[in-house]
Every structure is written in C-alpha cells, then in structure tokens.
C-alpha cells in the first residue's frame, strides 16, 4: 500500500482542508467495498425450490422511453437503474430486511431474488448469493479500469449491481445490489403485476 501525506496548501483554509481530508478517507472505502476480491465470476442462478412466490412463466421485454421511466421512477431510482449509478453505502432500508419474501425490480417489478439467498456481506449493500433462475442478465463492465460483471433485470435492463467471487456457499458469489433498484414483497402478500 502507498501512503499519501495530505499537506494543506498555503491558500487553503482549515475548513476546506478538512473537507478534502474527509473525502480522501472515504474514497477508498467506496471504491473497495464493491470491488472484486478475485477474478470476474460467471453468473449462477438459485434453484427454483428457493422461490417464495410463483414466478411469471413468460415475460416479454419491456422497452420504455427515457421520458416514461423518468415519470415512473424517482430521480435516484432512475439514476441507478438506467444510468448505472451506485447508492451510498448503508443507505438502503433493504439492508436490514429479514422477512421471508421476494425482491423485485423497482422499475418493471420482475421478481429477481428470493429472501432465502440474501445474506449479510458486511459491504453496506443488500447482497445475495444467487438470483432467481433466468431473471437477470449480465455484461462486462470496464468503467473503473478493470473488468467487473454487471447484472441487470432480464426484462427491462435496469441496472442492479455487480457480481463478485467472495460470497458464501453454495455459489461463492456475491450479487452486490443497489437497494433502490429493488422493492421487497413479503411472503404473505401477492406479487404486483408486471409493469407494462
């Protein structure tokens, strides 16, 4: 590891220096919390027996315009789902959700994860060891200068997060998800209709 000394510039006031010092301390956490600890993984799905709700058998792709999505979603949801943003660490109420149920795409409502695959990863984002079968697609992401595996809703293409190879058994994978990209449906409630 390289140590960097932060020395205030002669024209920099104390408040500005402390602000920059704070950002310098937080930046490594934000960059490493959702970074791979090993090579880029292949996607794995959870067995159908782990589903809590009955999944839709057929779901045609949902292709809405940017204007339509902006009207339906909050600014933060849109930024994460359709501009591949990342929410602040530990900001999602879903991080502490422990009830049995199904996590659905916040955009189109496609079921993506069973609560049975959710676990506490210590990263500050909701994490799962596998998605429901056939509900997410993946692609290569090199925006940070190295290769990661991005995953998104198979129906609307809404960005969910990235896959890393530091998860628990049985897959060894961690689906690091943005909480704003999901909605939770408890087991005793019906899944909402897919958005059209």
Language-model segments: what does each one mean?
Residues 7-26:
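N-terminal secretory signal peptides and thylakoid transit peptides that target proteins
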Residues 33-76:
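C-terminal segment of N-terminal export signals and the immediately downstream linker at the start
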Residues 105, 153-156:
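Short cysteine-rich clusters marking metal-coordination/redox-active sites
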Residues 109, 157, 177-180:
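Cys/His-coordinated zinc-binding microdomains
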Residues 114-115, 162-163, 185:
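Short, non-ligating residues that shape and space the ligands of small metal-coordination modules
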């Amino acid at each position: 590891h390289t140590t960097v000394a932060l020395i205030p510039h002669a024209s920099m006031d104390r408040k500005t220096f402390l602000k920059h010092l704070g950002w310098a301390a937080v930046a490594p956490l934000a960059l490493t919390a959702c970074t791979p600890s090993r090579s880029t993984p292949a996607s794995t799905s959870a067995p159908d027996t782990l589903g809590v709700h009955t999944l839709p058998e057929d779901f045609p792709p949902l292709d809405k315009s940017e204007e339509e999505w902006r009207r339906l979603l909050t600014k933060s949801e849109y930024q994460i789902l359709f501009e591949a943003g990342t929410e602040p660490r530990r900001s999602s109420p879903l991080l502490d959700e422990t009830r049995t149920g199904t996590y659905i795409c916040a955009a189109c409502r496609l079921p993506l994860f069973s609560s049975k695959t959710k676990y506490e990863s210590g990263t500050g984002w909701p994490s799962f060891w596998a998605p429901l079968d056939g509900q997410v697609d993946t692609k290569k992401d090199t925006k940070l200068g190295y290769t990661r595996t991005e995953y998104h809703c198979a129906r609307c293409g809404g960005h969910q997060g990235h896959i890393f190879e530091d998860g628990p058994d049985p897959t060894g994978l961690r689906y690091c998800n943005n909480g704003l990209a999901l909605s939770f449906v408890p087991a005793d409630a019906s899944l909402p209709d897919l958005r059209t």
